[in-house]
């Protein structure tokens, strides 16, 4: 049989394109901002992870330009060999001080970070225990490791304890959870997770891709939000969301970080973060430190949007209803209905992300909306009016 046979067979993507409701790969002709030019038309952006709006901040953009002029376009090598810039070390040092974790390792992307951390830390005789709604990169890391993976029902602490009880006493265990869940916008039950980890001798890793710049003191993330910075062993995060760039990181003790530097194949065998991306991430981090009010503004706008949607009759996923995060999922349930609604909203000038199974449970398709500290109430009202109108028309 031809290994490419699957490429020629019918697929959901081909079906959606034929039906005129394919929702992916829309091209922008502008900067990533609260309003964008997308496919030749002005759209209000409610689908970006640019939570602090820093992709267009002048100091961030200028830092990238200066780095290109000083270091050139790329590093042409691994951090392990010729690809370490002085600026990489500065970024790691300043991020470590900000997160209050001395051991920082930076990776090329957030996805690569999870794969690189988990595959290095979880050995053949270890167990990794995951929330079912964790990001796909966490599962990729589990698959690349030699350990045994166990999963617990989403935010179900009784089921987490049940999985911990399955780990033999002589084996190591790592609990991995999103801090803020990327689809649902709800927050992990970190106090309970840390308590169970302590009881059963497990370690805790938090993927804070959507928590950095969003939660905690000055935007330090989910562990800071709960006052559990000393009880979370490993943070993972990304530079592509609140820090307006590209890349990812691990924050831990210096001993754990040093081990990962020498054991993580994705770290050792990948080129380092390019100069412009490194510089913009560092500039965005400094901007966040100088302007912690952005975190408060983001929270305020997120609450404004939640109230506005509820008042307009939109059904927000219950677990995210009162969460102080900028991710607000609107239930639309059936796949084709969701795509039709998303297309109509898009055609009327608002970009949202339709999210379908398997990214959601079957029958629970939704519109994932997300917000920036640089949105205005007037823009949100305009967007929410359009969404509510379309949802009523498609009931």
Task: Give the residues covered by each predicted segment.
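Active-site phosphate-binding strand-loop segment of PLP-dependent enzymes
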Residues: 150, 154-206
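Active-site C-terminal subdomain of aminotransferase-like
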Residues: 200-203, 210, 215-324
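N-terminal "arm"/small-domain region of PLP-dependent enzymes with the aminotransferase-like
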Residues: 5-73, 202
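Conserved N-terminal alpha-helix of the aminotransferase class I/II PLP-enzyme fold
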Residues: 62, 66-110
């Amino acid at each position: 049989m031809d290994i490419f046979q699957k490429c020629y067979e019918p697929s959901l993507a081909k079906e959606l394109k034929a039906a005129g409701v394919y929702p992916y790969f829309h091209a922008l002709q502008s900067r990533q901002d609260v309003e964008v030019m997308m496919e030749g038309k002005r759209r209000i952006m409610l689908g970006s992870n640019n939570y602090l709006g820093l992709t267009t901040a002048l100091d961030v953009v200028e830092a990238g330009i200066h780095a290109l002029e000083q270091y050139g376009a790329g590093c042409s090598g691994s951090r392990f060999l010729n690809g370490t810039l002085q600026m990489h070390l500065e970024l790691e040092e300043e991020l470590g001080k900000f997160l209050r974790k001395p051991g920082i390792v930076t990776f090329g992307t957030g996805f690569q970070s999870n794969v690189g951390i988990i595959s290095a830390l979880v050995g053949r005789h270890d167990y990794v225990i995951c929330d079912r709604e964790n990001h796909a990169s966490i599962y990729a890391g589990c698959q690349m490791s030699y350990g045994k993976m166990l999963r617990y029902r989403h935010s179900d602490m009784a089921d987490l304890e049940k999985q911990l009880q399955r780990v033999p006493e002589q084996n190591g265990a790592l609990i991995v959870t999103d801090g803020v869940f990327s689809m649902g916008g709800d927050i992990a039950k970190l106090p309970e997770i840390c308590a169970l980890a302590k009881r059963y001798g497990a370690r805790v890793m938090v993927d804070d891709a959507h928590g950095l710049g969003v939660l905690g003191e000055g935007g330090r993330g989910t562990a800071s939000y709960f006052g559990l910075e000393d009880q979370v062993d490993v943070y993972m995060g990304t530079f592509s969301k609140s820090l307006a760039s590209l890349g990812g990181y691990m924050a831990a003790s210096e001993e754990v970080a040093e081990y990962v530097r020498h054991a993580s194949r994705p770290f050792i065998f990948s080129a380092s973060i390019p100069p412009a991306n490194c510089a913009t991430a560092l500039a965005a981090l400094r901007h966040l430190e100088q302007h912690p009010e952005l975190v408060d503004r983001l929270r305020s706008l997120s609450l404004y949007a939640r109230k506005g949607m509820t008042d307009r009759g939109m059904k927000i996923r219950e677990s995210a209803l009162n969460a102080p995060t900028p991710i607000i999922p609107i239930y639309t349930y059936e796949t084709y209905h969701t795509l039709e609604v998303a297309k109509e909203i898009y055609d009327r000038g608002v970009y949202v992300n339709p999210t379908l199974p398997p990214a959601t449970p079957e029958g629970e398709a939704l519109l994932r909306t997300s917000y920036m500290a640089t949105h205005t109430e007037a823009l949100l009202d305009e967007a929410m009016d359009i969404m509510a109108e379309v949802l009523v028309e498609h009931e």
